[in-house]
Curated annotation (Swiss-Prot):
The chain crosses the membrane at residues 30-50, 53-73, 87-107, 113-133, 140-160, 167-187. The lineage of its organism: Eukaryota, Metazoa, Chordata, Craniata, Vertebrata. GO terms for molecular function: enzyme binding. This is Probable Bax inhibitor 1. GO terms for biological process: apoptotic process; cellular response to unfolded protein; negative regulation of apoptotic signaling pathway; negative regulation of RNA splicing. The keyword Transmembrane helix applies. It is found in: Endoplasmic reticulum membrane.
Length: 237
């Protein structure tokens, strides 16, 4: 039998029998909101890079934190849904503006790194998301404690590097942070599924978790690629 004559049912690739229909609908809403967040964040970064109307810094960080707190404090129901989506868009926009210092650093080295980092982040995010969706339910939730310990280690490394100013320690922080955030994609995806199965259908807030995972991976991957490119240029001189 010719292998090329076989009929492949692509629909079966996207059937998750271990996830209820209502949760699958919830996940569609989560990823739709995530897509909107990505678009709005890209707009925020674009406005800065092209027009310089907004400057990324402490104000944008405080603004995004304020928006996130406002979103968390606003109850999820049909009456507040549009309001919460607007707050989510504001949070995503300010987060995009907050990326600008990193973008400026990368553009000064090699602008093409931004596209490479975005594509790389997308591949990483999709692969780890599918792994979490196809895996046995709750199989990655045990990572929660390990990931939180990893964040504590990253914090200690940051504090140490404030005194030592070591490039090697900074690079180790970036690589370890990238690994930890990949783990968060697994854990957060399955945690969202479990919350939805237990009746928590707040897709707006759930999209925030995944959005922060994506943005953090993107930021760290950009810096890693930029530093590697910078080192290669130094070696050529």
């Amino acid at each position: 039998m010719n292998v090329f004559d076989r009929n492949i049912n692509f629909d079966s690739l996207f059937k998750f029998s271990q996830i209820s229909h209502s949760t699958q609908v919830h996940l569609k809403n989560v990823y739709s909101s995530l897509a909107v967040c990505m678009f709005v964040a890209a707009a925020g970064s674009y406005v800065h890079v092209v027009t310089r109307l907004f400057q990324g810094g402490m104000l944008s960080v405080l603004g995004s934190l304020g928006m996130m707190f406002w979103l968390a404090m606003t109850p999820h129901n049909s009456e507040t849904e549009k309001k919460r989506l607007a707050i989510l868009a504001g949070f995503a926009f300010l987060t995009g503006v907050g990326l600008c210092p990193t973008l400026d650093f990368v553009i000064a080295i090699n602008p093409s790194i931004i596209v490479t980092a975005f594509l790389g982040t997308s591949v990483i995010f999709v692969c780890f998301t599918l792994s979490a969706l196809y895996a046995k339910r709750r199989s990655y939730l045990f990572l929660g404690g390990t990931l939180m310990s990893g964040l504590s280690i990253l914090f200690l490394m940051s504090m140490m590097n404030m005194f030592f100013g070591s490039v090697m320690l900074f690079k180790a922080h970036m690589y370890l942070g990238l690994l930890i955030m990949c783990g968060f994609v697994l854990x957060d995806t399955q945690l969202i599924i479990e919350k939805a199965e237990n009746g928590d259908k707040d897709y707006v807030w759930h999209s925030v978790d995944l959005f922060l995972d994506f943005i953090t991976i993107f930021r760290k991957l950009m810096v890693i690629l930029a530093l590697n490119d910078k080192d290669k240029k130094k070696e050529k001189k």
